[in-house]
Amino acid sequence: MPYIDLSAFPTTQTAFGRWQPLNAPLGVGAFGINAIECDPGEAIDTTHDETDTGQHEAYIVVAGRAEFRIGLDIYDAVPGTVVAAPDPAATRSFRPLEPGTRIICIGAAPTEGAPAFGEWIG
């Protein structure tokens, strides 16, 4: 299915929050894509790095508001904000600042000879 309404798609409660695994439903496998729905005060810890996997990650806030920490940098992100963590060794985390915060998380390890996505835009 190439279309998902996140507000109607079920979440799965984990030790790391309420997640929506999106790869299988969307039929994509070249990168990881999931969404998390979270509220302030939830006991979730998203602090991690990707040293073991080499992944680059990007986060897109689609609802609510969140604070991201990427290395030593802090970002206040509202809907439409994209935050990236291209350095696998950088510690990254986020926390919701408003109820109903929803973040799409995308990650993949770079491959040698990978195309420069977006170059066609100019």
Where are these regions (language model features)?
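Residue-level recognition of conserved beta-strand positions in structured domain cores
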Residues: 35, 70-72, 87, 96, ...
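Short, conserved beta-strand element in jelly-roll/cupin
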Residues: 51-68
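Double-stranded beta-helix
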Residues: 3-5, 95-122
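Structural motif
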Residues: 65-67, 74, 91, 100
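Short acidic-glycine-tyrosine-enriched beta hairpin
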Residues: 71-89
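A short, N-terminal "cap"/entry segment at the start of jelly-roll beta-barrel domains
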Residues: 1-49, 119-122
